[in-house]
A protein has these predicted regions:
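Conserved beta-strand/short-helix segments
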Residues: 1-203
C-alpha cells in the first residue's frame, strides 16, 4: 500500500477530513493486480499504527478494482462534492482496465459518492451504479489523472478535471487532452463516455 496517497476530503461529513491510500498492485480476493484503495476516516485520536486490513466500515473501508489488471488506485484524490449532497466524493484511477469502449489497456476514472454511513468493509468498483458513483470511460492509454476542479461554472456543484496524456486529438499522436466534467445533483449513469461532452455537461 502507499503507491499513491491523498486527502479524501470529508466523505462522511463528520467534521473530520479523511485519507485515501492506493495500492494499485494489490490482488483483492485473488483478482490479480485489480488494485485496492483504502479510506481511513479522520477522528480525534489514533493509535501509533493502523493495519489497513482492520478497516471495517466504521473506521474506514476498502475499494477494490473491477477486474483483473485494473490497477485501481494508481492515482487517487478527493473529487470535491460533485453531486452537491454535502459529502465529499472520491476519484480513483484504474490505469489498465483491460477493455473499455473497444480500447485495450485504457484507463478509466471511478467516482465514488460520499455518504454519512452504510459503507461496508469493502466495495467493488464494478458495483458503481450511478447512485453510488460512476465510471468515466473512453480514455486512450493507461496514463490518466483526475482531480477536483472546484466549481468552474458557478452552479454550486464541484467539477472534475481529467488529463489523458496519451490521447490523440485531431489525429496528433500522444499530444494529450484534458476534460472537464460538470457536477450535478442527479442523472449520472453507471458509465459516462467522455466523447459525449458537449459543452452543457462539460468540455
Amino acid at each position: 500500500s502507499g503507491s499513491s496517497v491523498s486527502s479524501a476530503g470529508d466523505i462522511n461529513s463528520d467534521g473530520f477530513d479523511d485519507l485515501i491510500i492506493g495500492a494499485s498492485n494489490a490482488s483483492p480476493d485473488g483478482i490479480e493486480n485489480a488494485g485496492s484503495s483504502y479510506v481511513v476516516y479522520g477522528k480525534t485520536l489514533f493509535n501509533k499504527e493502523l493495519n489497513l486490513s482492520n478497516l471495517n466500515g466504521r473506521n474506514g473501508f476498502r475499494l477494490d478494482g473491477a477486474m483483473k489488471y485494473d490497477q485501481s488506485g494508481a492515482s487517487i484524490s478527493s473529487a470535491g462534492d460533485i453531486n452537491g449532497d454535502g459529502f465529499d466524493d472520491l476519484v480513483i484511477v484504474s490505469s489498465d482496465s483491460v477493455l473499455l469502449n473497444g480500447i485495450y489497456y485504457s484507463a478509466s476514472i471511478n467516482v465514488v459518492f460520499g455518504k454519512s454511513s452504510g459503507f461496508s468493509a469493502s466495495f467493488n468498483l464494478s458495483d458503481l451504479d450511478g447512485k453510488s458513483g460512476f465510471r468515466l470511460i473512453d480514455l486512450e492509454g493507461s496514463d490518466a489523472v483526475a482531480k477536483t476542479a472546484g466549481d468552474i461554472n458557478g452552479d454550486g456543484f464541484d467539477d472534475l478535471i481529467v488529463s489523458n496524456s496519451f490521447a490523440d486529438p485531431n489525429d496528433i499522436e500522444n499530444s494529450g487532452s484534458s476534460y472537464v466534467v460538470f457536477g450535478r445533483s442527479s442523472g449520472f449513469d453507471a458509465t459516462f463516455d467522455l466523447s459525449s461532452l458537449d459543452g452543457s455537461n462539460g468540455f
